[in-house]
Amino acid sequence: VILFNVKEPEQQEKEPEEIQAEVMQNPETMTQTAENIEDKYKVFDTMSEDWGSDDLEGFVFYDLPEQYADKGYFPEKMQIYTRCLCKQNDVPYALVLAIIEYESGYEFDKTGDNGNSKGYMQIYEKWHTDRMQKLNCIDLMNPYQNVKVGIDFLSYLLKKYGTVQDALAAYNYGERGAREHLWNNGVYVYSYNTAIMQRMKEIEEVVGK
């Protein structure tokens, strides 16, 4: 028996306007889309706003740069929480914002390095299991836990190496990697830490130090 494959007629690719029109004509599709978007951001409701007036003193809401506004999301509650952690850990708030911008473009659910680097600060989970356990952070895709781990790591690096540029190199390469690939070769300033330090200065003009 010879079986013949019957080729279906090729469907023409629909124009964006046609797709939008179909969605507008289907209220159920619109509802499902809205629900999916709402579910995605529910994680931001998992943190209580238990900060006081002292924590809010000097706070300036940071509007995301236009190029990150579509995919990025960094709501006021997240900004206040991040700023509070920075103050507690003696880490420059503008530095953390610059790292988040560079690493994830303010996409809290972003993954990189084949899924190993996660969240706002692109934490590579394999190298931070002890830190996560210490901080009781088990989910790096939770934005609050992600920045808590990242800021704690930054605090450690800043205290150990003394400068933002070296702390950033160790954040980027890992301490051993920075030593072997950069410092042992006399390299201390390179594209990664240069870009972030420049953005940190620019962001400081908006949110302060």
Where are these regions (language model features)?
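N-terminal export signals and maturation junctions of secreted/periplasmic proteins
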Residues: 3-81
